[in-house]
Amino acid sequence: MSLASGADVAWAANPAKPLSDKKFDTLAAAALEAMKQKAAELNIQGVAVVSYAEGDNVLGWSSKMAVVGHLTDPKASASGNNLLGIAYAKSAEMARTLKDSGTSGTAPMTGEFGWQGGVMFKTGSGYLIVAFSGGKSEDDVQVSKAGLEVMKKGL
């Protein structure tokens, strides 16, 4: 195998370091704040979750969440909706598929819904996984993207 440029050689010799707990906490707080602001802009409430998983496969993660107005939506269905559960289900689907929630093209497994609203990004050391639940899927995606962009800029 030949490496064509000095940048490639530097990357191969110095793989990206995983996010420290302190760095993740800082990025997560900023991302959750951005998600709260975007949700307010869209006039929706729900739950925001941001996670970081080290490595090429998701075998564990660190996560933070924030209630953005409501933890549950009692009027959404006969039994209500646990918005935290839905946000984590979106995150779990992304952990399995390594694709944004609802976009894998495969049938959801038990415990997954296949709903859009979660986005992810492969870093040099792992994955950023961001999800929101509480609005329409397209609004949830916008809120999640707002959080992800803040995290990406902070890397």
Feature map (PLM): residue ranges:
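Flexible, solvent-exposed loop/hinge segments and secondary-structure transition points
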Residues: S2-K122, G126-L155
